[in-house]
Amino acid sequence: MFILSSSSSTLPSAPPFSSTTSIFLSFSRVSLPPSSSSLKLLPLSLQFGPPKLASSCSLRFSASRAMAELIQDKESAQSAATAAAASSGYERRNEPAHSRKFLDVRSEEELLSCIKKETEAGKLPPNVAAGMEELYQNYRNAVIESGNPKADEIVLSNMTVALDRILLDVEDPFVFSSHHKAIREPFDYYIFGQNYIRPLIDFGNSFVGNLSLFKDIEEKLQQGHNVVLISNHQTEADPAIISLLLEKTNPYIAENTIFVAGDRVLADPLCKPFSIGRNLICVYSKKHMFDIPELTETKRKANTRSLKEMALLLRGGSQLIWIAPSGGRDRPDPSTGEWYPAPFDASSVDNMRRLIQHSDVPGHLFPLALLCHDIMPPPSQVEIEIGEKRVIAFNGAGLSVAPEISFEEIAATHKNPEEVREAYSKALFDSVAMQYNVLKTAISGKQGLGASTADVSLSQPW
C-alpha cells in the first residue's frame, strides 16, 4: 500500500507508559545500504504496495529520540519534506540503455535460449540465470493450471517483461531510499506487478470481507486522518494481491498504500522489479541485522532514518500504512500443515500506536486479515541466503478488515502499562485471526459467500 509535512517544533508528550520506546516493527524484506544479502546478491539472487493508496521483519528504534531529533529545528519538517519528494519518488527518471533482447522473444524456446546467451555473454550471473529459468517454469505451470485459454500468450508476455526488468537491474542496480515511492514512469512498475500477479488469482474463489469498511477508511484519509493496517503477512506478493482485490472498488487504497518492507525484497534481483512498483518504507530486518557484524551500525542508522521518514509522513496526515507486526511471513504448523497468522509482537504494535499518537493528526489502527499463502508460499524456514526457491500456484485469495479497536477502552480495564500493551496487541491479533478463519472457511473450506458471519460479510466485488 502509501505522503507528508508538519510543523510543531516540540515533541508531543509521551504516553504514560515509558519515556523512550524500543520500537519493534514487523516487516517483510527490502534493500538499503550494502547488506549481507546485497553483497551475496550482486553476483545473484518479494513481501511489496502500489503508488497512490512481502514481508515481515523486526526493527528496534527509540521512537521518542527519533521524534525529538526529527523536530529539533523549525525548518526540519519543510526541508525533510523537500528531501523526501526529491529522493523517494523517481530515482530512475531516464532509464539507461541496456540489453532489450528479452522483449524480442516470441516463444518459450527463444526465451530459454536468451537466458543462456545472456549468461554466456557475462551479462547474467549463473545463479540469477538459474533463478530466472525456475521462475519462468513455475509461473508458466501456475498460469496454465488456471485454465485460461490465453495462458501461453499471458505467460510469454508477462515473463519477457519481467526478465527484461530483472536484467536491467542486474546491469544497473536500483537503490531504494528509506521512503520509496512507486515508479510509474517512464516504465510503470505498478501496472507491471499487477499484470504479473493477476493471472495467479482465482477470482471465482476469492473474497473481500467487510467491503464497506474500506470505504470508511478512504473517507478518513480524505479528512486528513492517518490509517494503519495491522495485518498478518503471507507471501512476497501480498501488496499486489491486496491491490488486485481492491482495484475495482477502492483504487485509491490499491495504489496508495505504503508498505513497511524489509531489506531482502529490495536486494533480491528476482524481487526488486516488483518492489520498485510499490510505495515502501524500507528497513533492515532484525533477523539479519548481525549477518555481517561490521555493517550492523550502518543498518541501525538506516532504520532510524526510515523511522523519521515515517514520522514525517504521519505528521502530514492522509497516510495509509500497512505493517505486519509478526516478524515474518506466516508459516504452516510443522505437525499439522495448517496455516495460521503468526503472533504479533506487542512492542511493534505499541510503537506504531505511539507514532500515530505523536503525529498530532487523528489516527486509526484497523486489523486486516490476508489469506493467499498457496499462491506464493514462503520457504518452510527462515533462510539467511538471498534467492529463495519460488513456488507459484493458481489459487483463491482473501482480504478482510474489521472495525478499529479502541486503545483507550482497553487501557481503562488494565492498570499495568505492560498489560495494556499486551492486551491491545492481543485484541488486534484476535480480530485478524477471527477474520482469517472466515476467509479460510470460504476459500479452503469451499463454503464461499456462505462462510459470512455477523462480524465478517464476504463479497466478490469484481
Curated annotation (Swiss-Prot):
InterPro entries: G3P_O-acylTrfase_chlp (IPR016222), G3P_O-acylTrfase_N (IPR023083), GPAT_N_sf (IPR038114), Plipid/glycerol_acylTrfase (IPR002123). Disulfide bonds: none annotated. Pathway: Phospholipid metabolism; CDP-diacylglycerol biosynthesis; CDP-diacylglycerol from sn-glycerol 3-phosphate: step 1/3. A motif (HXXXXD motif) lies at residues 233-238. The HXXXXD motif is essential for acyltransferase activity and may constitute the binding site for the phosphate moiety of the glycerol-3-phosphate. It is found in: Plastid, Chloroplast stroma. Keywords: Acyltransferase, Chloroplast, Lipid biosynthesis, Lipid metabolism, Phospholipid biosynthesis, Phospholipid metabolism, Plastid, Transferase, Transit peptide. Residues 1-82 form a transit peptide. Signal peptide: none annotated. It catalyses: a fatty acyl-[ACP] + sn-glycerol 3-phosphate = a 1-acyl-sn-glycero-3-phosphate + holo-[ACP]; sn-glycerol 3-phosphate + an acyl-CoA = a 1-acyl-sn-glycero-3-phosphate + CoA. One of its GO terms (biological process) is phosphatidylglycerol biosynthetic process. GO terms for molecular function: glycerol-3-phosphate O-acyltransferase activity. Esterifies the acyl-group from acyl-acyl carrier proteins (acyl-ACPs) to the sn-1 position of glycerol-3-phosphate. The physiological acyl donors in chloroplasts are acyl-ACPs, but acyl-CoAs are used as artificial donor for in vitro reactions. The enzyme from chilling-resistant plants discriminates against non-fluid palmitic acid and selects oleic acid whereas the enzyme from sensitive plants accepts both fatty acids. Squash is chilling-sensitive. Does not seem to discriminate between the acyl-ACP thioesters 18:1-ACP, 18:0-ACP and 16:0-ACP. PANTHER family: GLYCEROL-3-PHOSPHATE ACYLTRANSFERASE, CHLOROPLASTIC (PTHR35695:SF1). Its EC number is 2.3.1.15, 2.3.1.n5. CDD domains: LPLAT_GPAT. This is Glycerol-3-phosphate acyltransferase ATS12, chloroplastic. It comes from the Eukaryota. Belongs to the GPAT/DAPAT family. One of its GO terms (cellular component) is chloroplast stroma.
